[in-house]
From Swiss-Prot:
GO MF assignments: structural constituent of ribosome
Record's keyword terms, sorted: Ribonucleoprotein, Ribosomal protein
NCBIfam families according to UniProt: L29
Keyword Ribonucleoprotein part of the UniProt annotation: yes
Signal peptide start-end: none
Lineage: Bacteria, Bacillati, Chloroflexota, Chloroflexia, Chloroflexales
Keyword Ribonucleoprotein listed: yes
Stored InterPro entries: Ribosomal_protein_uL29 (IPR050063), Ribosomal_uL29 (IPR001854), Ribosomal_uL29_sf (IPR036049)
GO biological process terms held by the UniProt record: translation
Family: Belongs to the universal ribosomal protein uL29 family.
Protein name per its UniProtKB record: Large ribosomal subunit protein uL29
Organism: Chloroflexus aurantiacus (strain ATCC 29366 / DSM 635 / J-10-fl)
A Gene Ontology cellular-component term: cytosolic large ribosomal subunit
Gene name tied to this protein: rpmC
Pfam families xrefs: Ribosomal_L29
Amino acid sequence: MKANELRALDDAQLREKLAEYKVELFNLRFQKATGKLTNTARPRLVKKEIARILTILRERELAQAELG
């Protein structure tokens, strides 16, 4: 997903996506260890998605701290 699409989601949905991506990354690591990973670029993409989500959550957290 693009960052703009992620920003349209609320915090609960972002945390849900984050959990999904973490599970996917965990499974991809196992596939790599067993030699069954076919798309070797996928783990890198999943890590970037996780970073995007964490960045957006942190931005919102800091914005709330400034306001209140």
